[in-house]
């Protein structure tokens, strides 16, 4: 009889999901759990993430698009119907409104009969990185740090199995961070948060080691999987040293670097999307091969996320990738296969040294909060991302199917009637608003008023925000009401854009110089310099593309008007009129491009700029691209369009066409 081989326990397996409505998302969750998924990872829509109810004007077109809409406890109960929260491990990707969504989760668990002490899961709750990448911040940095701190202090005392914050290097990589910058900025964020918890006085010295032990990280894993393995080993080394030396953590268990992963979604391509399958598998190796640095939880994107929302079958495929690696291979039968490798050791040391030096530069500015407020970190990320995009454009950084090996057969994966993606029913927004109105009509308005008054008093007075928020959840307060109460007290914030960086070397190349000459010449023909407005309408905060267009446009001679994210169509039209721009470039990655274009055109018409050429970039299916052009969009750009010089020539010629000038060709 053969002795069974001893195998390590697999990581927690999740798929990041949520769309349309709480009911539809609940059905998806229960289906995924039946297929062997071992935890939930909830995606919320943008209004929920930024603190708006579904009927707010800024929520138009965004409801249910990139996640599930949660306006109140009724939605939260529907989301977890037949899912016992006392037995589930739930990760919630939520930041600015994390205190609110956790309060709703606790309230629903209590209604199910569970106690807070039974709950297991994670709130992302890293608002600092929102100022640098995803853009779903609401309040200024200092009040945001206070909210993060309150959640940590509350959960350590009351929900001891909860991970109150996921310090995110994931989004930093997608915003352009190198591995060294990922390490430095994530650990600098952890320092800022742990220092704030300690300074708040909510946790005594005797309990602070428990705080350290509950800090977790959410990490990206890119295609260079050997380097990614080294990055994770460097994270572990640096965290162990930091928690011992700065925070006096003695327990090895409390110092353990605890992290979950989603592999690189923005590295997936629209061109030849079938190649994304092997990309995802290789990226998974970077955070599973090394036992000492293995992820504790993993969620894989679907192969088609560069095209749009994945279907249930696509999410099943992503889950099966994890299961094959964990249960069919011999990965979990061995110790750390990288121990003793001089190559790995040297790479880890180089990453540690580089990250330590960058952390020192952050601390010289007063810490991570101050380095964000000054724009320093954002400029570093925009610079790194610009260098990466230029390397792809030149062909130095090869992306199969995008800038090399572009010959291809037609893919059967995208040949069906649905073009290989899930499309949210346009009725979802209207139906969510109807449910919200019914909920408001049935609740006790006096209880709501009292709960909001208590919340406001708590926010002003400095007490922990969680108990008051849980009372709000039970009273029937809505997401928009909770957030607006805090907006009235803390104010709102606009983060630095980071585009004020030195010109890239490519801006001095022959093609860029030739484009700049034509831009200057056209400006002289029209009597003033050419001016572009780059606009981010709606609630989508993914600004990488807009920033790169702004930087490139500036480098080839255009004057750039870019005021950052979350603009209303009215603000865009007003800025176009006041700034006298020649063309508007819109960026929308949330799937709400049709609604946003309609609203922007309506506003341009009202200010007398109906003639103004407008282009758009984003994750836009071909069928939608045709529709947008029918509505008047001059050009549509998607992630496969990497020739930035070519885009600049397109823009120049659209301006010339608008003024009855002949197009120019730039060699």
Name every feature range the model reports, one short phrase each.
Residues 60-65, 90, 130-139, 174-176, ...:
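Short beta-alpha connecting loops at secondary-structure transitions
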Residues 1-228, 246, 253-260, 294-301, ...:
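Catalytic alpha/beta active-site cores
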Residues 546-652, 656:
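Cofactor-cradling patches in redox/metallo enzymes
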Residues 311-312, 316, 320-323, 327-514, ...:
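Flexible, glycine-rich loop/tail regions that form catalytic "lids" or insertion modules at the edges
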Residues 10-11, 256-259, 528-530, 607-616:
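Short beta-strand/loop segments at the ligand-binding rim of alpha/beta enzyme cores
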Residues 126-129, 144-201, 278-359, 365, ...:
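Mobile "lid/hinge" segments at catalytic clefts and subdomain interfaces of large enzymes
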Residues 187-190, 218-220, 225-310, 314-318:
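Glycine-rich anion/phosphate-binding loop at the beta-strand->alpha-helix junction
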Residues 652-666:
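The C-terminal output helix
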């Amino acid at each position: 009889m053969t002795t069974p081989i001893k195998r390590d326990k697999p990581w927690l397996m999740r798929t990041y999901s949520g769309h349309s409505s709480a009911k539809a998302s609940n059905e998806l969750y229960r289906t995924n759990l039946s297929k062997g998924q071992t935890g939930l990872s909830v995606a919320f829509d943008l209004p929920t993430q930024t603190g708006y109810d579904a009927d707010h004007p800024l929520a138009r077109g965004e409801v249910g698009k990139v996640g599930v809409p949660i306006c109140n406890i009724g939605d939260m109960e529907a989301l977890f119907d037949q899912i016992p929260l006392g037995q589930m491990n739930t990760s919630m990707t939520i930041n600015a409104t994390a205190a609110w969504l956790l309060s709703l989760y606790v309230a629903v668990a209590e209604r199910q009969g569970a106690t807070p002490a039974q709950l297991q899961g994670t709130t992302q709750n890293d608002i600092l990185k929102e100022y640098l990448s995803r853009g779903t911040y609401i309040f200024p940095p200092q009040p945001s740090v206070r909210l993060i701190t309150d959640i940590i202090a509350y959960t350590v005392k009351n929900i001891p199995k909860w991970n109150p914050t996921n310090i995110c290097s994931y989004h930093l990589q997608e915003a352009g961070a190198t591995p060294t910058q990922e390490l430095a900025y994530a650990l600098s964020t952890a320092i800022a948060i742990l220092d704030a918890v300690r300074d708040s006085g909510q946790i005594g010295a005797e309990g602070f080691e428990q705080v350290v032990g509950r800090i977790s990280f959410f990490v990206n894993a890119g295609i260079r999987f050997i380097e990614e393995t080294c990055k994770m080993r460097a994270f572990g080394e640096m965290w162990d040293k930091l928690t011992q030396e700065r925070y006096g953590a003695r327990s090895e268990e409390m110092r353990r670097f605890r992290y979950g992963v989603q592999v690189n979604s923005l590295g997936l391509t629209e061109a030849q999307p079938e190649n994304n399958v092997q990309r995802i598998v290789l990226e998974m190796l970077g955070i599973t091969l090394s036992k000492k640095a293995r992820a504790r939880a993993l969620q894989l994107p679907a192969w088609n996320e560069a095209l749009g929302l994945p279907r249930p079958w696509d999410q099943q495929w992503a889950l099966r990738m994890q299961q094959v690696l964990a249960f069919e291979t011999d990965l979990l039968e061995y110790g750390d296969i990288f121990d003793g490798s001089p190559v790995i050791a040297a790479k880890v040391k180089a990453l540690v040294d580089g990250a330590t030096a960058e952390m020192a530069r952050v601390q010289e500015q007063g810490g991570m909060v101050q380095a964000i407020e000054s724009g320093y970190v954002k400029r570093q990320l925009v610079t790194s991302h610009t260098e990466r995009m230029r390397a792809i454009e030149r062909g130095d950084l090869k992306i199969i199917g995008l800038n090399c090996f572009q010959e291809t057969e037609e893919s059967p994966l995208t040949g069906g009637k649905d073009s290989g993606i899930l499309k949210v029913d346009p009725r979802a927004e209207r139906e969510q608003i109807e449910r919200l109105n019914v909920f408001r009509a049935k609740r006790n308005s006096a209880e709501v008023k009292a709960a909001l008054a208590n919340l406001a008093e708590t926010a002003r007075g400095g007490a922990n925000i969680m108990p008051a928020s849980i009372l709000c959840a039970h009273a029937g307060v809505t997401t928009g009401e909770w957030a607006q109460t805090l907006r009235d007290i803390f104010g709102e914030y606009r983060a630095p854009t980071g585009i004020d960086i030195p010109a890239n070397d490519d801006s001095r190349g022959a093609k860029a110089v030739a484009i700049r000459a034509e831009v200057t010449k056209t400006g002289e023909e029209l009597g003033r310099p050419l001016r572009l407005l780059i606009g981010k309408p709606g609630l989508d905060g993914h600004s990488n593309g807009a920033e790169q267009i702004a930087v490139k446009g500036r480098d080839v001679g255009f004057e750039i008007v870019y005021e950052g994210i979350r603009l209303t169509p009215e603000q865009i039209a007003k800025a176009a009129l006041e700034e006298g721009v020649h063309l508007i470039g819109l960026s929308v990655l949330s799937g709400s491009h049709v609604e946003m274009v309609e609203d922007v055109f309506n506003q341009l018409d009202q200010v007398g700029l109906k003639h103004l050429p407008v282009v758009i970039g984003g994750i836009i299916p071909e069928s939608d691209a045709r529709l947008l052009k029918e509505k008047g969009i001059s050009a549509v750009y998607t992630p496969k369009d990497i020739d930035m010089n070519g885009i600049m020539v397109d823009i120049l010629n659209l301006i010339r066409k608008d003024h009855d000038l002949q197009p120019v060709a730039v060699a």
